[in-house]
């Protein structure tokens, strides 16, 4: 696990002592999978590309990057983020903007969708989510990225 927040890593290590916590991501270690859930909106807009480049360099050629983020198009998500103490400095990012940044780094989108359309009190409607993944009002979205195969053949 890696987190810029040393406090988060201390908490993780205390609760799950078997987890290997990394002090930095520098591209030396290579991973099959890197998973970010609700992280990008905490990274300042001005350094997102730099951080995502480090992540790109830390993936194996066949590796995947999976990102889940809050959807700024969803009005309820905006209310939750606005009232969350952890999100005081949050800068939500649209799915298309995240994809654009990642494609500029040489990631290729493997899959993406909007998710979480219904609150838990309406879970019987969750079966409809697979038909709504294109609709921009899900509470969150995910993107699965891989390294651009045409560039991998060159490297």
What are these regions (language model features)?
Residues 90-106, 111-112:
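Short alpha-helix
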Residues 43, 81-97:
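Acceptor-substrate binding/catalytic loop of class I
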């Amino acid at each position: 696990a890696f987190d810029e927040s040393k406090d988060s890593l201390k908490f993780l290590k205390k609760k799950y002592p078997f987890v290997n916590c990394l002090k930095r991501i520098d591209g030396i270690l290579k991973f099959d999978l890197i998973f970010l859930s609700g992280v990008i909106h905490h990274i300042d807009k001005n350094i997102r590309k730099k951080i995502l480049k480090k992540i790109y360099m830390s993936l194996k050629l066949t590796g995947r990057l999976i990102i889940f983020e809050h959807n700024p198009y969803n009005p309820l998500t905006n209310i939750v983020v606005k009232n969350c103490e952890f999100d005081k400095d949050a800068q939500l990012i649209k799915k298309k903007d995240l994809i654009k940044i990642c494609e500029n780094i040489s990631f290729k989108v493997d899959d993406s969708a909007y998710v979480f359309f219904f609150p838990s009190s309406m879970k019987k409607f969750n079966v409809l989510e697979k038909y709504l993944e294109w609709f921009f009002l899900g509470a969150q979205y995910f993107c699965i990225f891989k390294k651009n195969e045409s560039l991998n053949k060159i490297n």
